[in-house]
UniProtKB/Swiss-Prot annotation:
Family as reported in the entry's similarity comment: Belongs to the NhaA Na(+)/H(+) (TC 2.A.33) antiporter family.
UniProt cross-references to HAMAP family, sorted A to Z: NhaA
Gene: nhaA1
Ranges annotated as spanning the membrane: 23-43, 58-78, 96-116, 126-146, 155-175, 178-198, 224-244, 265-285, 298-318, 334-354, 367-387
GO biological process, one term: regulation of pH
Membrane topology annotation: Multi-pass membrane protein
Organism name: Brucella anthropi (strain ATCC 49188 / DSM 6882 / CCUG 24695 / JCM 21032 / LMG 3331 / NBRC 15819 / NCTC 12168 / Alc 37)
Listed GO CC annotations: plasma membrane
Top-level taxon in the UniProt lineage: Bacteria
Stated name of the protein: Na(+)/H(+) antiporter NhaA 1
Amino acid sequence: MNHSPNQSRPVSIMRRFLDSESAGGVSLMVAAALALIVANSPFSQAYFDILHTHIGPLSLTDWINDALMAVFFLLVGLEIKREFLDGQLASWPNRMLPGIAAAGGVILPAIIFTAFNWHDPAKVRGWAVPSATDIAFALGVLSLLGSRVPSSLKVFLATLAILDDLAAVVIIAIFYTAEISMPYLGGAFAAAIVLFVMNRMGVMKLLPYLIGGAALWFFVLNSGVHATVAGVVTALMIPLKAAPGRPDDMTSPLHVLEHALAKPVAFIIVPIFGFANAGISFAGLDASVMRDTLTLGIMLGLFIGKQLGVFGAAWLAIKTGLAQKPLGATWIQLYGVAVLCGIGFTMSIFIGLLSFPSDLMQAETKIGVLAGSGLSAICGYILLRLVTKPKNT
């Protein structure tokens, strides 16, 4: 059966996306492991001193979390827009299974975390920490299985993680906003309106959008809303079409910017974030940290809540006819992928940093995230390896 170029192009886009993200996941794993080693070595003090060094108005850690991660969210926004308008999420039938599964994977971990921490208002602020899936890390683990896993499951995991990221962006914007500065918020709205007008007027040069996005980031940073939201808003204003009324092609501003950012984000920005934020010094910490409700809520929310929430919601959607099971996938394979959804790392640590100001609570958050993500990665990988066989080529 012959396929037109337009029919095959979204698949090739997703394949390139998967390749980039899975390779980036390996880089993230290495960066996180290196951070843990350095933070517990004779170089520990130098590591933390460098991260707290001020460069202009912000510390190095703040530049990473507020500026570099805004670029990460810019790429996330570009991927979300492309997938909704021209990719795997362009039709409602394709959105149903990952959408329902993503909702289950956000709600149940939050319930489990809250059940452990409802008695402490300071801790319950972190309810969203175990609700995220790290797309790079999860696809990195999945890539280690090669041809054992049907491509439909890789697409399912990628689209679910994209919707998960969208939920995280909304959660950050609504629930993790500090005291609002109305003048700066007004400036942010003005910058967003300028970007919108440029889009409607058919401006096809990237530079004006990047300048407008930088202005938007400055205003959002000082408004009290987290600066990374600026990255997503900017992405949504960048045109997907090469010209108004023309079919989409790879020369459109969105495709050009997405292609330019994919590898720097996967191999530079995300590993830098992992190296800067995964470093936990275990000096002074004892076994009681693992029994703390904050650590347990995050760890079990990721490891238990994610897999049960994702798989349970997917099973219900398929059994009720709301969605179809991924082509060529078995129930146990779908469950294995649901286990991998408990790898929260980047977004979970990021939300944890927004939730808790104290060093101890941040350390407990990171331990919970690392434990829950590690268990999910190991168990998901072992399960999928045991129940699948590589395809003969």
